[in-house]
Amino acid sequence: AAAGQFKHVGLELGGKDPAYIRADANLENSARQLVKAGFSNAGQSCCGVERIYVHETVHSRFVEALKAEVEALRLGDPRKPETTLGPMVRFQAALALSDQVNTTIRQGATPLLPNKPPERAYFQPQILVDVNHEMNLMTEETFGPAVGVMKVADDEEAVRLMNDSHYALGCSVWTADVERGVELAQRVKTTTLQVNRCDFLDPAIGFLGVNDSQRGFTLSHLGFQMLTSARYYWIQDS
């Protein structure tokens, strides 16, 4: 729209938000909140959680809790009150996600839920384990109801992997030690840092990204600056 014109452009270009579950995290609450963050709106949120790193000592228990939460979702007509997971934006989007999931499975990942082809725009939610950063689902934007869960040995590995992405919108750290959580989140090269919560927006707080995720700002006074021009008045008594 701005091609050939002298206009300012702001771009929001997608994300691959990570979450890190430390060994001392509340696993049930973390799983419940991360399903909301990763599967709400059928996973079609640029700041939704798409990759989860879990300390190896609690990996199995967390995965069990996460699977139970996802299995409780009800895929169906969004107009029906019992539906908790609706369709993707169009059939082509569901097919693209199915291709990404199948590619990652061929690369060695293990699906925890039935891997069914999409019916129209309806995609069965999926969790993939035994994943790594050589796999498609852990490196490219998913934008649908599927998430990869990767085991890590310690905080250092978690931070390194969270930073191993060309996207950078947000991140979250889940821990009983809030001070340590803040310290770790600050080491992630992104712009929205959250501890024991995720995928939360407030109109008063700027939404922005770095790397290949965003140019410009939305929300807060920064968002207004993207759409307005400053005016200065110099007034002197006559």
Where are these regions (language model features)?
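ALDH superfamily catalytic-core signature
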Residues: A1-N132, V195
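Conserved C-terminal structural/oligomerization subdomain of aldehyde/semialdehyde dehydrogenase
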Residues: R74, Y122-S238
